[in-house]
Amino acid sequence: MTELETALAEFLPTQRWFAGKGRVVAEVRVESSVPLRTALPSLSAVVAAVAYADGGVERYHVPVGHDRGLEARQLTDRASDAVIYETEGPKGGPIYDAARDERLGGVYLDLLSRAANVEELRFYRMPEWTETLRGPGRLLAAEQSNSSLVFGNRLILKLFRLLEPGENPELEVTRALAGAGFSACPAPLGWIEGLGSTLGILQPYYAGSVDGWKLATERVADHYESKDGEPGNFAEDAAALGRLTAELHGAMATALPKVAEGQPDLGRLSGRLLGQLTQVVALVPELADQREAIEEVYTKAEAAGGGSRHLQRIHGDYHLGQVLKVPEGSGEPRGGAPVDRGRWVVIDFEGEPARPLEERRRLASPLQDVAGMLRSFDYAAFQPLVLGEDPETPGPTRDELARFEGPAAAWIEANRKAFLDGYLTRAGDSGQALGGDHELLLRAFELDKAVYEVMYEARHRPPWLQIPLGGIRRLLGVSP
């Protein structure tokens, strides 16, 4: 391996967006290195193939910067984890992840504004992007699987790290929704393609917005502090989110592929649900007490089958963190045509990053998105009990959750009802047929989502484990 490849083999597993944590890296091979700026600080768009000891291969996009002198030292001092390796000699200096260098983010923006072609990379610009904006790109700290650069609180460039063949769903779906006239999501203003993959997408940035998770957990705190026992003041927002979700599903059904009523694939669905349940019970034996009851719900949902006959593209990773409350004046995605102000917008259409691209594109019941949001309400209600994500930090016990059950259940139920009322009313208005047995299917999807959460928390956030376990008990009507 070259010096860069050897260094990347050590560097990549340390990054938060690296998907192969826990796997042994056998080799890294640079497939492409396209110079985007040759003067210092220089920038190259690198695509590296990571081969694992177990035989798998993944491809990663790494913007690689190089600089020397005082500014280089200042960068490495404040972001030492961005350094890939150091070069020696009079022209030496750090080789680093350029997403951490605000000076170099503007190189991507300039190439997009000019719709440039640089070797095998293609930079596309939508005609709706009319404003001229230059300057540094500020890296958002909250990203997990990608890296996002914000320019002037107006634009956001999402750089995809783990690459898969074909068009990224974030680009595919938002472009289709924009074409269908759905304005409650960030329309693409430009994108980067190379080596058969989408490397990045430029979208409007909603400055001053607040995500649904933050807003909901603030309302939960208000609820627990109130003396009258009222379930907080999030229900109006929950109803608005329900209506928005139905509008989103209607737009996706119009703009993207769908399966007509009468073509269910319930056998595959039931097999997947039961397969995941078996896997999670082996990991968390505490779930074994509810296994029979969960299987009964799955069996009844398969036998009824009504709601699953409507299959279409869905969001696929839908929860309170994927919706933003946009303040007055925030976000002008088409250079002067602002989105509707003071309402919710939906973001992040990639689907669950851990799932293969083919699976994320698979047609599914829109009720899976509904189930995801309902489970998010459950998490928000119990979030104040969670002390942290450190595996060494003890989380709430089952008894502690039981003591919170009354006020938490009141908040959950109020917002579930508001969301579902909003969703079903708007879905009915738009002619979306959910089927007469949608409640049974929704319950099965909620249980499946909670079972997945049990597996995730057991592996990654043990202090949170009792939250999905408690959610399963509530869905089954089992006492806390």
State the predicted function of each range:
Residues M1, G329-G336, G477-P480:
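Actinobacteria-biased recognition of intrinsically disordered, low-complexity terminal regions
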Residues W129-E143, V284-G329, G335-R361, G431, ...:
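Flexible, glycine/threonine-enriched loop-and-boundary segments that flank and lead into catalytic domains
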Residues M1-E27:
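Short Lys/Arg-enriched alpha/beta "domain-start" segment
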Residues A260-T299, A410-G428, M455:
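Active-site catalytic-loop/activation-segment of kinase and kinase-like phosphoryl-transfer enzymes
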Residues D399-G436, L440-P480:
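ATP/Mg2+ or Mg2+-diphosphate-binding catalytic cores
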Residues L43-T278, E328, G342-R343, I347-A409, ...:
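Conserved ATP-binding subdomain of kinase catalytic cores across diverse folds
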Residues Q279-A288, R309-I314, G342-F349, L357, ...:
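C-terminal amphipathic alpha-helical interaction region
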Residues V24-A39, V47-A49, T299-E302:
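Short amphipathic beta-strand and strand-loop transition segments with alternating hydrophobic
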